[in-house]
Regions:
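Core beta-strand elements of the Rossmann-like FAD/NAD(P) dinucleotide-binding domain
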Residues: 243-249
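Short beta-strand "acidic-cap" motif of Rossmann-like dinucleotide-binding folds
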Residues: 115-122, 126
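Conserved N-terminal/central alpha/beta ligand/cofactor-binding core
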Residues: 4, 49-51, 128, 134-219, ...
Length: 249
């Protein structure tokens, strides 16, 4: 049985773990009955400068079921919704344009479902892009296709990796899990204002690419999608410019 417990308030000056387990006991959860404890959120209440508090939300896997109706802070945890499904056309190639967050996670999902994502990116892979960007900062000579805006990871690669969204989606947990698996700090999963950090973000992007490749995906960098060929309201082909050779196909 998995349950969530919210609004656990602990003074910043107290032993956090000890106080959390005290609150769990008050809500019918003994330490002996806990199989696993996971932080879902941690925020700070700093309205009173002399009494700053942490506020926690936890997910707890219990060894034995308990009666949730007795405790207002407890609720049944949601089941995983991002299940794997069978591909309609397994091993079919699907084009993905761009390696920003949308492109990378689209490619990952397609690969998980058994498709072969073919990813086209006008810029360079992240390590080469970083060298090109440093060269631009030093010389002011711009590579129009690989720079601070374009290249693996998208424009956000040179941000501090803040993880903001205005939507409430059940898939956010999946995204965070993938980021952590690819090298992000586990704290992003439960911090109120999570961010990865620029240096770590580059590692995460590279590892995410390698995971997609391990599932059968293919990446073509320095490949600019110039146009889309449409016939009878169906996409038939992509027109690609190979940036280095200037060849079109």
């Amino acid at each position: 049985m998995k349950v969530n417990i919210s609004n656990i308030i602990v003074s910043i000056n107290k032993n956090q773990e000890k106080e959390i387990y005290k609150e769990l006991e008050r809500n019918g959860i003994s330490r002996d009955n806990i199989e696993n404890l996971k932080y879902l959120r941690k925020s700070i209440d700093s309205r009173k400068k002399n009494d700053i508090k942490f506020i926690y939300t936890l997910e707890i896997t219990l060894k034995k079921n308990i009666n949730l109706e007795k405790y207002t802070k407890l609720s049944l945890a949601k089941e995983e919704v991002y299940e794997k499904r069978m591909a309609l056309y397994p091993k079919r190639e699907v084009a993905v344009v761009g390696t920003g967050p949308a492109g990378l996670f689209s490619a990952l999902r397609l690969a998980e479902l058994g498709y072969i994502p073919i990813v086209f990116e006008r810029g360079e892979e992240v390590d080469k892009r970083n060298a090109t960007t440093k060269f631009f900062i030093k010389t002011r000579i711009l590579n129009p296709n690989s720079n601070i805006q374009f290249g693996e990871g998208g424009a956000g690669t040179y941000s501090d990796g803040k993880l903001n969204t205005r939507i409430k989606s059940e898939y956010i947990e999946k995204v965070f899990k993938e980021l952590i698996e690819c090298g992000a700090q586990e704290e992003i999963f439960w911090n109120y204002k999570p961010h990865i950090g620029t240096d770590v973000l580059r590692i995460v992007v590279k590892n995410l690419r390698e995971k997609i490749k391990s599932l059968g995906g293919k990446f073509y960098f320095n490949s600019l999608v110039e146009d889309i060929e449409v016939k009878n309201n169906e996409i038939k082909a992509l027109k690609i410019l190979e940036v280095d050779s200037q060849k079109r196909y």
